[in-house]
A protein has these predicted regions:
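Short, flexible turn/loop "capping" segments at secondary-structure junctions
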Residues: 1-4, 45-46
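Active-site-flanking beta-strand signature of metal-NTP-handling nucleotidyl enzymes
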Residues: 5-10
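Short, surface-exposed ligand-recognition loops at beta-strand->loop->(often short) alpha-helix junctions
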Residues: 12-17
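Localized chelating/binding microdomains
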Residues: 25, 54, 95
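An amphipathic, aromatic/His-enriched active-site/gating alpha helix that lines ligand/cofactor pockets
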Residues: 26, 32-38, 57-90
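Short, glycine- and small/hydrophobic-rich beta-strand elements in well-ordered beta-sheets
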Residues: 29-51
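Solvent-exposed beta-strand sheet faces enriched in polar/charged residues
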Residues: 41-43, 55, 91-93
């Protein structure tokens, strides 16, 4: 298996920043408990409070794929278009 690293950047509209921050924060603990999650870190950019960055390591691509189908993510996914200032930027890396 090849370990997978994801670095994702999410930028909120200023008027939806707090709502998005809340939704994103709620994903951290359930995700960390998922099978195959090595680590899952959520950060707010030091210079732009509307910019959120995720750093994730997964045991395999299959584990990441399973994560993206988890029920706890669905409330977030259904709101993204309304909350985001631009599309999510994802860097998909292998170790």
């Amino acid at each position: 298996m090849t370990q997978v690293t994801i670095i994702g950047t999410v930028i909120a509209k200023p008027e939806t920043r707090e709502e998005l921050h809340c939704l994103l924060s709620k994903q951290v603990m359930p995700t960390r408990r998922e099978d195959g999650c090595i680590n899952y870190e959520f950060h707010v950019d030091a210079k732009d409070s509307c910019c959120f960055v995720f750093y994730e390591n997964w045991r395999s691509q299959a584990d990441l794929d399973a994560h993206l189908k988890m029920p706890h993510l669905q409330p977030l996914f259904t709101q993204l278009e309304r909350l985001l200032a631009c599309p999510v930027e994802i860097h998909h890396l292998h170790m």
